[in-house]
Curated annotation (Swiss-Prot):
This protein is probably a component of a manganese permease, a binding protein-dependent, ATP-driven transport system. Probably responsible for energy coupling to the transport system. SMART domains: AAA (SM00382). Belongs to the ABC transporter superfamily. Residues 1-233 form the ABC transporter domain. SUPFAM superfamilies: P-loop containing nucleoside triphosphate hydrolases. It is found in: Cell membrane. Its main location: membrane. It comes from the Bacteria. It comes from Listeria monocytogenes serovar 1/2a (strain ATCC BAA-679 / EGD-e). GO terms for molecular function: ATP binding; ATP hydrolysis activity; ATPase-coupled transmembrane transporter activity. The lineage of its organism: Bacteria, Bacillati, Bacillota, Bacilli, Bacillales. This is Manganese transport system ATP-binding protein MntB. Pfam families: ABC_tran.
């Protein structure tokens, strides 16, 4: 996946400034940086969910939007209307819709895919619950299950571990590593850099501009972290 000269602005204020990099296929890549660095903006800009001032994102010489059916997106929980009357099962079943098109309805095959995904995240016992009744960790598992049901090749996750329990975080991380081991490409916006070395193969260190990008052991150094975070107090955690 190639990002070339990506610039994004809100109300004429630059949020992402001329970012160019390549994201390796079959890797777990983390987007890391201080608050306000543009991490979520970069993720959404890559997917074409928000307007770009300039730049392009391509995969195999085609715009990334061309591969939309092969891309799964897990948004921040705050972006989801938890009052919407949908059950856990139906939420996960939505993951099968991109492959169905506009007319075809989900059948036995799709329902089994949803059940299999719920089993992987250990949420089958909650399938009839309304999503607003779930805890943060349970809800995040459901979002992951929806992505699994899609059978995507590329997974974008925006702060999937924020405000969830450790059991859910460990389960989700195991699933992401399993997907990576099966050749999937995974990009995660992440805020807890104490776990960066344990979670990711590569990182994108960002503060509106690209600070560094590459394998964790080469990129996640004290010097580069301090450059990205500036005067903000940062406890160096590479290798933890």
């Amino acid at each position: 996946m190639e990002i070339q000269g990506l610039t994004i602005a809100y109300k004429q204020k630059v949020a992402i400034d001329n970012v160019t990099l390549q994201i390796a296929s079959g890797k777990l890549t983390g987007i890391v940086g201080p608050n306000g660095a543009g991490k979520s903006t970069l993720l959404k800009g890559m997917m074409g969910l928000i307007p770009r001032e300039q730049g392009q994102v391509t995969l195999a010489d085609k715009p990334l939007t061309y591969w939309r059916k092969k891309i799964a997106y897990v948004p921040q929980r705050s972006e989801v209307d938890l009052t919407f009357p949908i059950t856990v099962f139906d939420m996960v079943l939505l993951g099968t819709y991109p492959a169905l098109g506009l007319i075809k309805r989900p059948g036995k095959k799709e329902k089994q895919l949803a059940l299999d995904a719920l089993e992987q995240v250990e949420m089958t016992g909650f399938m009839k619950r309304q999503i607003g009744e779930l805890s943060g960790g349970q809800l995040q598992r459901v979002f992951i299950a929806r992505a699994l049901a899609q059978h995507a090749e590329i997974f974008f996750l925006d702060e999937p571990f924020a405000g969830i329990d450790m059991t859910s975080e460990a389960l989700i991380m195991r699933l992401l590593k399993k997907l990576r081991d099966n050749g999937k490409t995974i990009v995660v916006v992440h805020h807890d850099f104490h776990k960066v070395a344990a979670y990711f193969d590569d990182i994108i260190l960002l503060n509106k501009k690209l600070v560094a990008h590459g394998p964790v052991e080469q990129t996640f150094t004290e010097e580069k972290i301090q450059f990205a975070y500036g005067d903000a107090p940062v406890a160096f955690a590479a290798g933890v």
